[in-house]
């Protein structure tokens, strides 16, 4: 999960760049592109001193391995009622990153 306070400390430096900066974080059930699925997507968008934040748990449609639970803190119970990725994908296209 995002550590928002850490990124907010950098917002002043990002502002000096005079362009938008987006930090994206994806969590998944593992590292295999063909077998594993996204469990969370989050981003921070810094522009003109403003910070936009988006964070969404995603139901991967498969169990999260215990080692991934230990690594990310995201449990099967947390994603059980979350939307599937294809349900949120259209919303992501509306985000101007």
Predicted features and spans:
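Conserved non-catalytic scaffold segment of RNase H-like nuclease domains
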Residues: 2-95
């Amino acid at each position: 999960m995002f550590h928002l306070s850490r990124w907010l400390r950098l917002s002043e430096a990002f502002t000096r760049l005079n362009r938008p900066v987006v930090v994206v974080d994806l969590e998944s059930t593992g590292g295999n592109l063909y077998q594993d699925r996204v469990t969370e997507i989050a981003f921070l968008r810094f522009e003109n001193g403003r910070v936009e934040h988006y964070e969404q748990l995603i139901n991967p449609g498969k169990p999260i391995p215990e080692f991934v639970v230990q690594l990310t803190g995201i449990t099967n119970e947390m994603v059980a009622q979350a939307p599937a990725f294809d349900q949120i994908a259209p919303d992501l296209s509306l985000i101007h990153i």
